[in-house]
A protein has these predicted regions:
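Low-complexity, Ser/Thr/Pro-rich intrinsically disordered linker/stalk segments at domain junctions
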Residues: 110-197
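Positively charged n-region of N-terminal signal peptides that target proteins for export
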Residues: 1-4
């Protein structure tokens, strides 16, 4: 019985067309590299960096550019950073402030539910799990393989709804975080698709 309940929970999470929820992920710092250097996580996942070994005294994990969402500070061999939690969808490049050639990237997709429907279906698109002071969200959409178009810009809502009554097709959505005070932005999140019949 317990296995059935767990399996149903996993299927429900995957039905959101995003990544399944993760409690924590650790990136290792080894030999002047972040491992893994490319990471895809669900919003709200706690990410830590652990410095295993290397030929230097310290490393950092510092988010690129003026968005400035995190900087772990110096990590010595054997130390683990405090958790970084990315609450909104987007793509977040980062580097070691001491060794700029050490780079990594974290991708956080939006979630859509359901992923298929009809012209009477209202689709839910989740951009973030919690409001973040000073941050807003931009959303783009495209029909099929068409060009990306701005749909909503600078919104504070964590969830938006989409209904398309004018026939079927495939729609894609992606979002990013931006800082209201200076306009700094994350990269666009991985795109998610809905199909309308």
């Amino acid at each position: 019985m317990r296995r059935v309940v767990i399996a149903a929970a996993v299927i429900a999470l995957l039905g959101l067309s995003g990544l399944p929820a993760q409690a924590a992920v650790q990136v290792r710092i080894q030999d002047f590299m972040f491992t893994p250097s490319k990471l895809a996580v669900a919003e709200g996942t706690a990410i830590t960096w652990h410095y295993d070994s290397g030929g230097t005294t310290h490393h950092t994990s510092t988010q690129n550019g003026p968005l400035n969402l995190w900087n772990t500070g110096s990590l010595l061999p054997g130390q683990t950073s405090s958790p970084v939690v990315l609450r909104g969808a987007g793509t977040y490049p980062y580097h070691c402030a001491v060794h700029p050639s050490m780079v990594g990237i974290i991708r956080v997709p939006i979630r859509v539910s359901p992923i298929t429907g009809t012209t009477s279906t209202t689709f839910t698109i989740r951009l973030a799990i919690a409001k973040q002071a000073g941050l807003a969200y931009d959303i783009q959409k495209r029909k099929g393989a068409g060009a990306w178009r701005a749909w909503k810009t600078g919104i504070a809502a964590l969830v938006v709804r989409f209904t398309h009554r004018a026939g079927g097709g495939t729609w894609w959505f992606r979002s990013r975080v931006h800082r209201i005070s200076n306009g700094a932005r994350s990269g666009w999140s991985p795109a998610r698709r809905i199909a309308i019949s």
